[in-house]
């Protein structure tokens, strides 16, 4: 599962939303707001750590435009990807393969801060692979993602994602 897919899973668990949840979280911010997330995948041979910084470039009633820079470490090797722009439509994606499995509220500590979060549990099947996840979202963080955990039939250990820094303008 890629970082983009993971973030999409985090934001698409409502049944069915009238507004794209990813758009809603970014629409509450001003241009220049950003979030840095760290994703860790443990494999049999090595840990893979990805750090992504997503910055809001523009927000309109129809869309939010973000740019993400990503650096991935495979053992002692590091790969930096070129910045990627993404338009997040205000309209939800009707083809989203997500099935909500539970919803609650919880207070957690992220980057040393206590945050009240909405917790979503979900299941999905994509390309014949079943996955489960749990995501903590909050309007305090640009983009909304505080923390997520994913498991899959083909992953030897859970994939974990957590916001480590952010600035909301």
Question: Where are the regions that the model predicts?
Answer:
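Acidic, serine/threonine-rich low-complexity disordered tracts
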Residues: 15-169
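Sec-dependent N-terminal signal peptides
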Residues: 1-13
């Amino acid at each position: 599962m890629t970082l983009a897919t993971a973030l999409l899973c985090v934001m698409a668990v409502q049944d069915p939303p009238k507004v794209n949840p990813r758009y809603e979280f970014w629409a509450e911010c001003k241009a220049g707001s950003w979030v840095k997330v760290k994703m860790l995948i443990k494999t049999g041979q090595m840990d893979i750590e990805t750090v992504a910084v997503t910055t809001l470039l523009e927000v309109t009633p129809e869309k939010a435009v973000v740019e993400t820079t990503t650096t991935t470490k495979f053992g002692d090797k590091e790969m930096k990807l070129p910045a990627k722009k993404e338009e997040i439509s205000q309209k939800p994606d009707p083809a989203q393969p997500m099935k909500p499995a539970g919803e609650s509220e919880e207070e957690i500590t992220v980057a040393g801060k206590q945050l009240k979060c909405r917790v979503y549990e979900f299941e999905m099947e994509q390309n014949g692979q079943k996955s489960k996840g749990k995501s903590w979202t909050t309007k305090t963080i640009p983009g909304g993602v505080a923390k997520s955990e994913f498991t899959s039939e083909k992953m030897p250990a859970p994939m974990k994602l957590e916001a480590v820094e952010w600035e909301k303008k």
